[in-house]
Amino acid sequence: MVIDTSALVAILTDEPDAELLEGAVADDPVRTMSTASYLETAIVIESRFGEPGGRELDLWLHRASVALVAVDADQADAARLAYRRYGKGRHRAGLNYGDCFSYALAKVSGQPLLFKGEAFRLTDVAAVH
């Protein structure tokens, strides 16, 4: 699976669906996250909880054995295409910059995407069930 920022923020902030999302992570032996999404998640978490929040993020990723995947040229191209097709102001999905990198890693790797919300459901990316 590819983990999107929305899912990880929900887990780290103990939102009502956090347990369900963590269960999905536990059930999938493949756990990846784009380095672009990692930065986006760190920005969100550290803006709310400071550096201790960032340490909790890193600890969670370590304990869950999530592999951070560097953005390469193929992913950058896929992210660009995602924005062209599904970007904010262009499509109802309204993908933002960070969303495009989660989408791209899922498409390039062939892994389903774990996310919260409805935006990705309006795209052609496979979702974690």
Curated annotation (Swiss-Prot):
It holds the Pfam family PIN. It comes from the Bacteria. Keywords: DNA-binding, Hydrolase, Magnesium, Metal-binding, Nuclease, RNA-binding, Toxin-antitoxin system. The keyword Amino-acid biosynthesis does not apply. Belongs to the PINc/VapC protein family. PANTHER family: RIBONUCLEASE VAPC2 (PTHR33653:SF1). Toxic component of a type II toxin-antitoxin (TA) system. A sequence-specific endoribonuclease, cleavage occurs after the first AU in the consensus sequence AUA(U/A); RNA secondary structure is probably important in substrate choice. Cuts in 5' and 3' UTRs. The TA system acts as a post-transcriptional regulator of carbon metabolism; in M.smegmatis 3 TA systems (VapB-VapC, MazE-MazF and Phd-Doc) may be involved in monitoring the nutritional supply and physiological state of the cell, linking catabolic with anabolic reactions. This is Ribonuclease VapC.
